[in-house]
């Protein structure tokens, strides 16, 4: 028996911000590969410890992977002419959100400090009887950031937490299963891979396995449309034929 101390984060932005501060990274120049590796390591640790993995963490992992893929795409070359076009950094949207999150994290911390300072001077009980004496400021920087997003966005969809059960399936087992299938078939749709999945948790584990194999350059995953099916193929097969 041994105890593992695992830091708990309020949300994906809290985890990302922690990794950026830990590695002393400039927000304007984030090495996505480094952050993605450490982010996926945390997700895998949660899964191995049989803990709940909120779907928002998985969505952020997919976002980081998409950014990495875009950054790895070769730049187009035009013969006979040079086109000076301002390239859009795939990290731009993420950086903007992280900067906003940082602002509200600082504001939240400032509020907490103000509450601490105020408690040193105002010790008398309030005269108004209907005020509950147990009222406290139970908020976090992640809560404030989420509230801000709700104000500026019409998207009020709630993301449910999905429990991943270690006893039934693991990332490692799904990786092996996918690699075996890719030996038999040249390409495979993600919908085919999860066809026999019995629970949402198993689908999430399968998706993490795909992300991990893409990160390790073992497979190529292509998605033509948003929320569309994902085409999976062994790394090198399609590339060699195209070249």
From Swiss-Prot:
Gene3D superfamilies: 6.10.250.2410, Structural maintenance of chromosome 1. Chain E
Subcellular location: Cytoplasm
Listed GO CC annotations: cytoplasm
Keyword Ribonucleoprotein on entry: no
Highest taxon listed in the record's lineage: Bacteria
Keywords from the named record: Cell cycle, Cell division, Chromosome partition, Cytoplasm
Biological processes per GO annotation: cell division; chromosome segregation; DNA replication
InterPro entries reported in the protein's UniProt record: ScpA, ScpA-like_C
Self-association and partners: Component of a cohesin-like complex composed of ScpA, ScpB and the Smc homodimer, in which ScpA and ScpB bind to the head domain of Smc. The presence of the three proteins is required for the association of the complex with DNA.
Family stated for the protein in its record: Belongs to the ScpA family.
HAMAP family: ScpA (MF_01805)
Record function comment: Participates in chromosomal partition during cell division. May act via the formation of a condensin-like complex containing Smc and ScpB that pull DNA away from mid-cell into both cell halves.
Protein name in UniProt: Segregation and condensation protein A
